[in-house]
Amino acid sequence: MASLADRVRGNGRIAAGLLFNLLVSICIVFLNKWIYVHHGFPNMSLTLVHFVVTWLGLYICQKLNIFAPKSLPLSKLLLLALSFCGFVVFTNLSLQNNTIGTYQLAKAMTTPVIIAIQTFWYQKRFSVRIQLTLIPITVGVILNSYYDVKFHSLGMVFAALGVVVTSLYQVWVGAKQHELQVNSMQLLYYQAPMSSAMLLVAVPFFEPVFAEGGIFGPWSVSALLMVLLSGIIAFMVNLSIYWIIGNTSPVTYNMFGHFKFCITLCGGYILFKDPLSVNQGLGILCTLFGILTYTHFKLSEQEGSKSKLVQRP
């Protein structure tokens, strides 16, 4: 009876964690878009706020023994911290200059680009069926972008840069975690302050600092509260992702990611009144089909590899 109660409590915690991640992941997209549309807060400055709040949050977490920091050589993290800056800045610029649907769908191109990077630079091999799933993903993104009535050429440039830098960042994070034998929170504990310092130097060259429209310019209390809330929610997204990965299976994590993908798309069209044509709808369905089949094949191949290792004498 006790074990049943423990299982129920455990499942309840997982359900609560998934629900929390769903809320904050969707909230951060809509809140950032709201800040850009209604307050015009500068992009790099908002990213800087996110990094600083994330580092402060991680500092509090390590003081509460949620994770143990590990001493790491800063020289080995410079490129990773720089790519972290680029990944968040370009992703936010894509959100600022595109509809939420186009922004969200463009992010799906990260998978094909990661596969290309790992194939050409790391000589990693992928099965034919995995490679074939990249076709509907790519076709769907192109369809959606081509028929987007709010198509913004600069926005697509930012989206493309965001995809490339995000893909590099994700590949390098995996490599660094393996090389340095650290988890994502231990790595982020060093990345966040390093990336903050880099942006602190870069911001004055690209954005006004004390003038109107700058981070220290005259802002309303509501705008500043929204920016601070955005930073706190960004930290909560990182923390909840770490918790989900540690407490659920890869299948749960991936399937839940697809659910968030669909909810964010629908929310963007409802909240921001973004027009949706039939061809865009087909593009979204095409991309979603590609993502789902990719996940199915990838997870089945991973399970097959594990079973072979178990059977090996």
Curated annotation (Swiss-Prot):
InterPro entries: Sugar_P_trans_dom (IPR004853), TPT_transporter (IPR050186)
Transmembrane region(s): 17-37, 40-60, 71-91, 126-146, 154-174, 187-206, 225-245, 252-272, 275-295
Record membrane topology: Multi-pass membrane protein
SUPFAM superfamilies named among the record's database cross-references: Multidrug resistance efflux transporter EmrE
GO cellular component terms, A-Z: membrane
Location in or out of the cell: Membrane
Main location: membrane
Swiss-Prot/TrEMBL keywords: Membrane, Transmembrane, Transmembrane helix
Highest taxon, organism lineage: Eukaryota
Keyword Transmembrane part of the UniProt annotation: yes
Residues annotated as signal peptide: none
Family matches, as PANTHER family: SOLUTE CARRIER FAMILY 35
UniProt function note: Putative transporter.
Family the UniProt entry places it in: Belongs to the TPT transporter family. SLC35E subfamily.
Stated name of the protein: Solute carrier family 35 member E3
Organism: Mus musculus (Mouse)
